Amino acid sequence: SDGERETIEVPGRYDVKPGDTMVITTVLPDDFNANVMAIRASLQTVRFYVDGSLRAEYDTKDTRPFGKDSASRYVFCNMSEDDAGKELRIELTSHASNYSGVVNTVYCGDKSDIWTNIFHNSSRETIIAFFIFFAAVVSVMFSIALSIVYKTHFDMEYVGWCMLLGAIWMLGESKLRQMLVPNASVLAAMCFVVILISPIAVSIYIDSIQGGRYTRVYTCIEALAAVNLIVCTSLQLFGVCDYIEILPAGQGMLAVCCVVVITTFIIDIIKHRALGYRPEMVAMIVALVLALIEAASVYFVVTMSGFFIGTGLIVILFVNIIVTIKRISEIEYKRQKEESDRLRNQTERVSLQMMKTLAATIEAKDDYMRGHSYRVAEYSALIA
């Protein structure tokens, strides 16, 4: 919007101030015959002009609940062979410094073919996200059921809640999210909320597997994360800052949580207390490393797949399934042993009572006969 012109390549990233409009112009070839053009808006308002006439527009100012930018999604513009030789102008506007000046791939062709290509390239992460989502729901419900049956708590419930947050984040970052929900802005906002809540979920889970040794430390982390969530959400709701602008605050809190978790792991390893939860510790370290890679990638790539976080969550899931099965086996073994001991003690008490009754009967007969018989002596020896 400052009037500067330059030749660009698509896709690409260019120096545009947040809030300024980047205008891309080109002349459609004479043999143009596509019926649709499409581009992915990355937190951008998009307008298509053909021969100076507005053909398509994507702007969520009237539908988004809060924020200054439109949620990322694919924007389609209907075209025809009659547009051949006409000027095409695409306007991109974003208030986010990470996305102003971003130009994604422009697609031409049939709408179904474009969606097929998008689905082919992006379906893997979405399928993983749905798998994690349903696995999380099953994990939480199964853990609650086990807790009721065995009258004890299972850490897998906390894993389920962490997985649920991760699945929501992955679905929110999915390139197919506009096919999943009618209002992509709400789902996009949930991605940032998940990052703000994550330190709380991670702290609760780690504190549980560590047996509450560092409850005070994790309580402080949870309190700080809750305050951070309230402050950031308030800034978003009152239009002071968008989530994307204060994202470093949430990522910083998550990084602090990770540092605390790693520190407690090191302390437990030094003091030989980590053996009790070694599988969970290894899985958590792998997941934390992958989550930090995913969180940091927002500053280097335009779109995130969620593949790293999904992989980390699946690792934690399978490790906790194994740990839970082992714990159930131990509980069952202990229960069966207690039941066996109870039955043995009960049998011994019944046998002792029978012998006492028999002895009393023999003694009564002895008193009646006023003498000891060989059989009385024999029974007495057995009882003794």
Predicted segments with their positions:
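Acidic/His-rich, divalent-metal-binding segments that scaffold phosphate/diphosphate chemistry
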Residues: 333-384
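First transmembrane helix
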Residues: 110, 116-150, 248-270, 310
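Aromatic-lined ligand-binding clefts that engage carbohydrates, nucleic acids, or primary amines
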Residues: 27-50, 88-90
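Beta-strand-rich ligand-recognition modules
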Residues: 46, 50-87, 92-104
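Juxtamembrane interface at the cytosolic side of transmembrane helices
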Residues: 138-168
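Accessory carbohydrate-binding/adhesion or oligomerization-edge regions at the termini
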Residues: 1-13, 91-120
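Interfacial "cap-and-anchor" motif at the non-cytosolic start of specific transmembrane alpha-helices
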Residues: 167-342
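Extended carbohydrate-recognition surfaces in non-catalytic/accessory domains of CAZymes
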Residues: 1-31
